[in-house]
């Protein structure tokens, strides 16, 4: 396993965490200033993994972001025998290293889309990058969806013109609730097992995916910051959030990986919405 690669990837995810938290806090500050409220701030909680590694969960519950979490973690050790066959390159000795960032935002306003993002670097006897981002609006708008997709398409096209259509298709296939036969949202990109043979290029691509999120999602939130909504719209949001819960508990790879590696339960389940209704 490459020590330098582990260090620089972990450092980037920490840096991206700081940039995102700062941007989200600025949005809360702006809203609080106009409304005469005290702005919410992120609360950070550190955790350690018994088998090796640690993480930091940053959580903010405010007036704009009903719940937004930004998790970073770096964990290592050995998979148990029962899981080794499920992870690429872990079949022989089960050793692994994983570092990454995971972001999930649930907004109070039903007019502002929920967002999920994660990028990660994993080493076993193999090594690869993975990640992506998707948008879940409760009241989809074509222009907003196009803006979100364009940001990630531009990041992809810098490296390979085949990336965006491939990763968009993978996102559509991945974020699909098979038991309901419906998509979770309006998509985005999703990639896994990315190893072109050029670590520097793959790492640069993963950094640019993070920068794409930073450029587009805060802008979407700000554009709808002061739009009024109705009780009926809020009720619909709470019901649709149930789909989010179903996906994360039934299909999400990150949730499964966290449980397989004995990760922090609060951090693993951070992605769940704060309030949900099931009808």
From Swiss-Prot:
Where are the active-site residues found? Answer: 116
Q: Which GO terms describe its molecular function?
A: coproporphyrinogen oxidase activity; metal ion binding; protein homodimerization activity
User: Which reaction is recorded as catalysed by this protein?
Assistant: coproporphyrinogen III + O2 + 2 H(+) = protoporphyrinogen IX + 2 CO2 + 2 H2O
Residues that bind substrate:
102, 118-120
- Its recorded name reads Oxygen-dependent coproporphyrinogen-III oxidase
**Keywords, ordered alphabetically:** Cytoplasm, Heme biosynthesis, Metal-binding, Oxidoreductase, Porphyrin biosynthesis
Encoded by which gene?
hemF
Q: Which pathway features in its UniProt record?
A: Porphyrin-containing compound metabolism; protoporphyrin-IX biosynthesis; protoporphyrinogen-IX from coproporphyrinogen-III (O2 route): step 1/1
Q: Please provide one cellular component term from the Gene Ontology annotations of this protein.
A: cytoplasm
């Amino acid at each position: 396993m490459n020590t330098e690669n582990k260090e620089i990837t972990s450092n980037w995810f920490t840096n991206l965490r700081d940039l995102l938290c700062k941007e989200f806090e600025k949005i809360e500050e702006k809203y609080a200033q106009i409304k005469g409220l005290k702005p919410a701030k992120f609360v950070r909680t550190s955790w350690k993994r018994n088998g090796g590694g640690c993480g930091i969960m940053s959580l903010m519950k405010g007036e704009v972001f009903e719940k937004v979490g930004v998790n970073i973690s770096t964990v290592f050790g050995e998979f148990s025998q029962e899981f080794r066959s499920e992870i690429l390159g872990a079949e022989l000795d089960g050793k692994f290293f994983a570092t990454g960032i995971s972001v999930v935002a649930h907004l109070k306003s039903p007019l502002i889309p929920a967002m999920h993002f994660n990028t990660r670097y994993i080493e076993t006897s193999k090594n690869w990058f993975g990640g992506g981002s998707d948008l879940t609006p409760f009241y989809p708008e074509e222009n907003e969806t196009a803006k979100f997709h364009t940001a990630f398409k531009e990041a992809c096209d810098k490296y390979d013109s085949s990336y965006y259509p491939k990763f968009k298709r993978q996102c559509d296939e991945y974020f699909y609730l098979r038991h309901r036969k419906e998509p979770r949202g309006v998509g985005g990109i999703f990639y896994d097992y990315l190893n072109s043979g050029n670590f520097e290029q793959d790492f640069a691509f993963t950094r640019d995916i993070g920068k794409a999120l930073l450029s587009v999602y805060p802008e979407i939130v700000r554009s709808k910051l002061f739009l009024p909504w109705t009780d009926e719209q809020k009720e619909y949001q709470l019901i649709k959030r149930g789909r989010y819960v179903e996906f994360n508990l039934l299909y999400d790879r990150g949730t499964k990986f966290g449980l397989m590696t004995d990760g922090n339960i609060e951090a693993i389940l951070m992605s769940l919405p704060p309030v949900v209704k099931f009808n």
